Amino acid sequence: LTLAAACMASFTFAQDAPLWMRHCAISPDGTTIAFTYKGDIYTVPVGGGRAMQLTTNPAHDTEPVWSPDSKRIAFASDRMGSMDVYIVSKEGGEPRRLTTHSGSETPVAFSDAGHILFSADIMPSAETVLFPSNGQFRQVYKVSVEGGRPVLYSPMPMERISINKEGTILYQDKKGYEDYWRKHQVSPIARDIWMYAPDEKPAYRQLTAFGGEDREPVWAPDGKSFY
């Protein structure tokens, strides 16, 4: 009886205080948080309340990304063997597969209401890369929310992308193989923040030059300053 009571208490705690809810993403309208829990995508109001499960596939669903109108969510899933990009309504329903490459593809942002940027390592030949990446130096591609053939958006790594309403991109670069979680790193290959504005010249502009790590930029609501 004591063991049974302990097991029941442990189960109750796991349900009331779940752990390892990851990859949180706040909707652009500021009302809802999408997150990953036990390999599925959930949403919950920012003020708290009951979470709604959006995906129920036995595969691993992760990395939710909101559309600009806060009505759809793109995510990565390995339900067909490797990570592909899927899209689903925030109300639930059957997700639609958008990419089909045998490599790993992960959504990073909506470039606009009709297109999703995703990271992948699928360059076709050695002539297209600067040095061997071992999957670490991923390119950025763009695909329509209706599906179709993806197009190359950036041959260089653009990590932790944040896009404002004008379409200007903030991202962190990647210069080497250094461990992402190495403490107190100060080196020439530490990450820096860059801005990419397609309609400006120069289109790329380095915003930080600290010897340590500068990373994970996020636009402020005004679209002019960032964290």
Which residue stretches match the model-derived regions?
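Boundary at the C-terminal end of the N-terminal hydrophobic targeting segment
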Residues: 12-16
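A flexible loop/linker signature enriched in serine peptidases of the S9 family
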Residues: 17-18, 36-42, 50, 55-61, ...
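Extended, small-residue-rich solenoid/repeat segments and analogous flexible loops
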Residues: 18-26
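Residue-level detector of Asp-centered blade-edge/turn motifs that repeat once per structural unit
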Residues: 28-29, 68-69, 111-113, 164-166, ...
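Periplasmic/extracellular electron-transfer cofactor-ligation site
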Residues: 45
